[in-house]
Amino acid sequence: MPASDELRSFLARMLGWSDERAVDLALRSLSLALDHRAALVLCGEGDLVPIAWALHRHTLGADRPFIVCDPRRGTKAASVRSPASRASGVAAFEAAIGGSLCVRSRRLPGDFSALVARLRDTDDVLCAICNAEIADPRPPLVLPAPLVVPPLAQRSAELDRIIAEYANDAIEELAAPASGFTPGDHAWVRAHAAASLADIEKATLRLVAIRTSRNLSGAAARLGMAVVSLSRWLGRRKLPPTMLSDHGSHR
C-alpha cells in the first residue's frame, strides 16, 4: 500500500476532511482488499466507477489493469475517459489479473457465480463493488466497512478545497506552471463542473491543458484524447472569459 499520508489525504478529499473516522475505516477496508481478504465496497450516489478507478491508481498504480465488468457496455478498450470493460465476469477476471476488477451491483453479469468462484480462488485480482444504495451510516460491527461517498451537495464548505486539490493534481500531472489554473478557472469549475468528484477532476485537468498549450491539438495530445472529443467537450460549455481571450482560436 502507498504511503499512508498520501492515501489518507486522497481519501479525505473523497470522503470529507471533517470525518476522520470514515477515513480510518476506509484505510482498513483498502488494506483488506489489497491483501485479497475482502472486496472493496463503494456506496453513494451517481456512477462510482471513476472513484474506484482513482483508488486503483492511488494504490496499485496506473500501470496495473483496471477492468469494469459491464454487460451493457460490452468489451471496450480503455480510453482517457473510460476504463476498459468486458461483458462477462470470467473475461473481466482474466483481463484484470494483476490489477482490479470493478462491478456495479445493478449490472451483474450472467456468469456472476462463476466470477465469484474465480475471485475466491485467487490473490491476483482486487474486486471493487460499486453499490448505488447508501450504506447504513452507523459504524459497522464487522469489517470491511463500505466506503460511503457523500454527495457534493452536502460538502459545500469543502468544495473550494476539493477544486484546488484537483487543480494542483492537474498542474503536477501536466508539468504546468501554477498560473495554468487561475481564480477565474476555479470559479468556472465551481459554477459549471462540480456535480461530482469525477467532473471536477476532468474539468480541472482539461482547463490546465488548454490554458498551457499553444492550441487545442496540443492540449488534446497532452491529455491523450482525440482533438474532436476535446472540441465537443468545449462546444457543450462556455469557457472562462479569460481563457477565451487567451485562446481565441482552438485549432
Feature roles, as predicted:
Residues 7, 30-37:
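Phosphate-binding P-loop
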